[in-house]
Amino acid sequence: MTTLDSTPTSPLENPPAHFLGEPFFAETLILLRSVRDHDFDTLAGLCDDDFGIVDVDPAGNARPIRDRAGWEAWFHELFATLAAMGAETDSTIDDYQAVVDGGLGYSVLYFTQTLTLGEHVASFETVATIIWKRTPDGWREARWHASVISSDVPAELAEATS
């Protein structure tokens, strides 16, 4: 596997301590770690995504997905593409805010996503709004919408991801 696989060097293994008690932060870490580790089963178990998602592809473009079948196809394709490229991804949490009210809540996650291919590293300053719903099995992501605010992509990576 070409992922970081929970190595201590990942910023997700030592997140900012002041976010640890915030609503949905533990779940958010699981989401980000699952993407980093290409762990489809864990990711799928935490996401209902009733209304689809808007995600970011390896080139930094918006990727709207409208239903669960599309969601599953997207992540299978994404993880296979990253593995075939020999690429690693990771995330650094820059800011996090959340509100919970009864059976619903939302969080706003500012993070820097990195895509590493060999010696080249692309970074994407990203904001995600996540809608959470309470289920009998705990909190689940009901909607994810990510937008790239800015990016720094070396020319070599831009060619590889286009």
Where are these regions (language model features)?
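Short beta-strand segments enriched in hydrophobic/aromatic residues
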Residues: 47-48, 111-113, 145-148
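Short beta-strand edge/turn micro-motifs at domain boundaries
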Residues: 2-5, 125-156
